[in-house]
Amino acid sequence: MADHVQSLAQLENLCKQLYETTDTATRLQAEKALVEFTNSPDCLSKCQLLLERGSSSYSQLLAATCLTKLVSRTNNPLPLEQRIDIRNYVLNYLATRPKLATFVTQALIQLYARITKLGWFDCQKDEYVFRNVITDVTRFLQDSVEHCIIGVTILSQLTNEINQADTTHPLTKHRKIASSFRDSSLFDIFTLSCNLLKQASGKNLNLNDESQHGLLMQLLKLTHNCLNFDFIGTSTDESSDDLCTVQIPTSWRSAFLDSSTLQLFFDLYHSIPPSFSPLVLSCLVQIASVRRSLFNNAERAKFLSHLVDGVKRILENPQSLSDPNNYHEFCRLLARLKSNYQLGELVKVENYPEVIRLIANFTVTSLQHWEFAPNSVHYLLSLWQRLAASVPYVKATEPHMLETYTPEVTKAYITSRLESVHIILRDGLEDPLDDTGLVQQQLDQLSTIGRCEYEKTCALLVQLFDQSAQSYQELLQSATASPMDVAVQEGRLTWLVYIIGAVIGGRVSFASTDEQDAMDGELVCRVLQLMNLTDSRLAQAGNEKLELAMLSFFEQFRKIYIGDQVQKSSKLYRRLSEVLGLNDETMVLSVFIGKIITNLKYWGRCEPITSKTLQLLNDLSIGYSSVRKLVKLSAVQFMLNNHTSEHFSFLGINNQSNLTDMRCRTTFYTALGRLLMVDLGEDEDQYEQFMLPLTAAFETVAQMFSTNTFNEQEAKRTLVGLVRDLRGIAFAFNAKTSFMMLFEWIYPSYMPILQRAIELWYHDPACTTPVLKLMAELVHNRSQRLQFDVSSPNGILLFRETSKMITTYGNRILTLGEVPKDQVYALKLKGISICFSMLKAALSGSYVNFGVFRLYGDDALDNALQTFIKLLLSIPHSDLLDYPKLSQSYYSLLEVLTQDHMNFIASLEPHVIMYILSSISEGLTALDTMVCTGCCSCLDHIVTYLFKQLSRSTKKRTTPLTQESDRFLHIMQQHPEMIQQMLSTVLNIIIFEDCRNQWSMSRPLLGLILLNEKYFSDLRNSIVNSQPPEKQQAMHLCFENLMEGIERNLLTKNRDRFTQNLSAFRREVNDSMKNSPYGVNSNDMMS
């Protein structure tokens, strides 16, 4: 250890400095010294001394965290004996010191949990030494309340620890441990926890006694952790709370068939203080969500009846629900009533009529108090949305009574939102309309609720809209109207326009009637009349929120009533014709385009409105029939002939705006490109006419670049806007004829300008990202649009430009030096990722014969590939998987390289080859299926190449192996562990995981086995021997069947046979292991 960390006193002083000092420099110095201490050889013994003799809680905390790091490390792990000693020491330490500082106790319990988890499969004398967890805590549970709290916390923390995957160990190992813990210990822990809770609820708990208080809290946490366990390894996304089913194992059935378990939590809810209730309700949420298949129909009905009774009791005594946490959890519980049970089952519950009345009243009251716990409203609306959606399908004879209650819920939502407007404006409160994501989520739910008893919904909306619209019109005509009154009516109309859009969007074709379509017509007429009024005032004033509501309405209207699938005889169109003279879809489309042009004219500097307006235009341009109708409109022809900043201000160069604000231009030109293509054909004059503004922009930038002094900001803005426009056009031009016009326009005239921009501004991603993205789009052979004539060299010329851009950018970006971690993606990795995508698109586009480059001494291909390697080696492995876009672009490029350019891969330096193989090895266990599948494909190509080269080297051939192949073989023979590790990983995933891409995994496996037959044999024996004696023969037979009829070659027929064998093998192994109490105790398989 370093000289300055000599004694315990010094260590304690460093801890004090680390946790207590306010001086940053002192803290950093202490942190550095303590990191050295953690990495020192005598750290373990010093930690024990700190725990034994340390005088401060901070030194005990340091010892516990250092020990946790030591037992967690994957390289140079601690021996088994040492870990057993640490585990026993920690238990004794906690037992003899029940009054430690809370954070020290917590850290020591974390240490125990980590040792137990990581050692779950460790054996000593045929005994799993870390599995006696209940025995470990029994002595705590039989002692004082403080000891009891420690014992319960140990179980709670252990359950939590085993449930959480960590990045330092493979996911396969985590799932294996979690499954074994679930099968061997979790139910006993849950039962123990429930029994202790029953004892606690049976006594008159003295909740003024803090220790009793703490015990109850820890028991509830433990129970919740048991119920929240990821039983089958599917909860990768914990942020989602929808359609959640708790996959309780069948062996737990008895606990849930016993009604006293459910009753326990409802009794606890009513008998303990409100501060504990949220945890009780969280447990009830999980219990209510147990999988349906755990019960038969009669059992489920009985369970549901008890559940509904408990909910009814809470609703009849709602005092505790005034606590926001209680209220939130109770709303979640209500939502689970419908997500896990069918309406047909609910209506058969004895108290259903009373309960649905209570829930409706509770919902209406909640909606009226809109300012209280707004995040909980989602769950209530979710319940009613699911109830309403089930009405057409319910077959039960019992009345569901939703025709009575859904209109009440709809009315409460609508009126409460309107009433909130005045209060929010008066008191300066946060406006829910500012959170468009939340508003949209609620409106999606309301769209289904509102369509139930739609006549009542429409009548209410018409009445409220007419009142607000009339008041609004009167205020606008009055000279004395206050701005506050105008703002209130605009706020109310904003909500109404949003809601009308939502209920129209909720139309379901098979359940709609002519009468309902006519009602939609009534609502649409009113919104369009309001639009005419507000548009006429835009020169003086406009309301951004109301405009966004209008765009939301137009988007819903487009989805339902415009397009190829809509019946034109709809009653809606008849109503539009009667009131507004809009006789058909073409006339309605002209209204859309008129609104789009108006918005772009008046709101060109308002990014939210501009981007949503352009998205609407883009969506309209996709439809086959609508785009053909649009082109005939004079307004669209105006856009095609006048797309300049003079008419559309957002196309201008605004020095105040951010460069990234120009993103919407790509959307605009994608739509214009589609519209232009409808009648373009081979008309080059029309094309050149359309491109005039872009030609002028390119000439302006070229002029600037030709002088030594130019306005850099203006040049950047002009160029960035231009390349964003061009990318939109390039994306839209997916036919050969139109794309060739674009290609011949940009090459060779303007390509040097793009290259010059990369040279000048490589360090500014706001400039390089749009340029690189344009190039990536130009080389993408979308819909086979890049088909050059046989006499044309354009394919090769295009690749030369691609190579030049990648090389220019790559070599310069590597000169940036150290980039801060929080900026590394924006400044460096994003551009590299686009370069990888660009190179992949060019290499896989099938419009270049890459063999000619070497033949004619052209270094374009070699330069691009060498730059790829330089860029790759500048990226840490962890970053490759941490940034999803980078992962996908890298692995898809690597797939193409291993498939078509394996000679290049084989020619790389040993450390580069090992880097690439390591990245494949890590990618095999990635959560992203695309990445994992790509890695399988890369590995298959490499293994196939290796196998072929090995086969050739053993045969007498007239053509010897190339120098690259020979070297590659030598490297692989020098480092067999990398390929062996991947064989182990692939086999592990296939046997133990929910393998979603089994076919992809099977392809490299045969090659891996044939290249490593001895290793595979050892691996197989290890797996077989780890099974209990009575299972070993069956497992041995599984492996025999896997290789049945497989020859020593990688021909397609042999591969297909192996893939079939592997499917059967996976089934048989899973069946064999289902009833096995043992796991696979193989270091190869587990590490």
From Swiss-Prot:
Look up the signal peptide feature and give its range. none
Give the subcellular location.
Cytoplasm; Nucleus
Entry's Gene Ontology BP terms: protein export from nucleus
Indicate the principal place this protein occupies in or around the cell: cytoplasm
Q: Which cysteines are joined by disulfide bonds?
A: none
Q: What Gene3D superfamilies does the annotation carry? A: Leucine-rich Repeat Variant (1.25.10.10)
Q: Which Pfam families match?
A: IBN_N
Which keywords are on file for this protein? Cytoplasm, Nucleus, Protein transport, Transport
Q: What is this protein called?
A: Exportin-7
Annotated organism of origin: Gallus gallus (Chicken)
Q: What is the lineage of its organism?
A: Eukaryota, Metazoa, Chordata, Craniata, Vertebrata
Gene name tied to this protein? XPO7
